[in-house]
Amino acid sequence: MVGRGEVWWGESPDEKGRPYLVVSRDAANESMRRMLVAPVTTRLRGLPSELALGASEGLPVESVASFDNLRPFPKAMLVRRLGSLGARQHEICRAAGATLDC
């Protein structure tokens, strides 16, 4: 099962493959075909809506999950688990709150 706070490699026919951070809740992830994800990028802008990721989350270089670009993504196109936020899952709510200006 794909879980909240996990970093996965995603393949889409519309764009190049890239890592994604799963942000949708686990109860929805079990039954939905699409999950809410934050795309991961190496373009660090220092925004409060970014969540820093790196080697401890399974990425080869310093990166961020961009919550300003949240999107639904087909679960079937998440092809390989790279890592997880682990105890840092609470940071998902912080970045989402910054995105929504809450």
Sequence positions of predicted segments:
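Compact nucleic-acid interaction/catalytic patches
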Residues: 16-55
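C-terminal terminal-subdomain/extension
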Residues: 57-102
